[in-house]
Design a protein with these regions (language model features):
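Membrane-embedded beta-strand positions in outer-membrane beta-barrel channels/transporters
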Residues: 7, 17-21, 35, 72-76, ...
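C-terminal beta-barrel architecture of Gram-negative outer-membrane proteins
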Residues: 36-150
């Protein structure tokens, strides 16, 4: 027994936005050389359109749902003076609506709170919990041993870093894990220290 099935693509996705980047070298260097860098993305529109044969087209809103935030980006400053280096950066993830929904009656009885988003999706309004915006910080400090240093550390770079400096927990979501691993996965381990050693031969 065999069966031949012809698949059809019945949905179209649309997304538009802007990517912004900035790199600036601060001109004065009395305390060392400072550099500023920023990379941000702005999502203007994001939706999906489904056209099922024999049925009316469906408009599915993807803006600020399931991790599709309007704003996302990072800004950081680095410093260098002699053999020393250091840096601090912040990573921002905007708010978005969770996939789980509640009823219009619950939304109304609660006084239409801001932590529930009212979104039009597939011809009806859905009421979703809002996962709040979050900012995490990373930092590092490093030192480069020169050719005149002790032979054990000569031409060696040492770098100590920390991820999620303030030890923030990932925001709560309705998924099985209680958070969104695709969006806030780096926050789950908490504050994480790193040590990097490299040597030039």
């Amino acid at each position: 027994l065999s069966r031949s099935i012809q698949f059809q693509n019945l949905a179209q996705s649309y997304a538009s936005g802007v990517d912004l980047s900035l790199a600036y070298q601060i001109p004065w260097d009395r305390l060392g050389k400072f550099a500023l860098a920023a990379d941000w993305s702005y999502l203007a529109r994001n939706y999906q359109r489904r056209e099922v044969p024999g049925g009316a087209p469906e408009f599915i809103e993807r803006m600020e749902t399931d991790g599709n935030t309007r704003w996302r980006g990072t800004t950081g400053v680095t410093w260098r003076k002699g053999a020393w280096t250091g840096g601090l950066s912040g990573y921002y993830i905007g708010r978005f609506a969770d996939s789980a929904t509640t009823t219009a009656a619950t939304y109304t009885n609660l006084g239409e709170p801001r932590y529930i988003a009212k979104q039009f999706d597939s011809g009806r309004f859905l009421y979703r919990y809002v996962v709040g915006e979050v900012i995490t910080y990373n930092a590092f400090a490093g030192y480069r041993f020169g050719r005149d240093a002790n032979p054990l550390v000569r031409n060696t770079n040492v770098r100590l870093g920390v991820v999620n400096l303030l030890d923030r927990d990932p925001p709560l979501t309705s998924g099985a894990l209680g958070y969104s691993p695709s969006v806030h996965g780096t926050m789950f381990p908490g504050r994480t220290w790193t040590l990097e050693l490299s040597r030039r031969f």
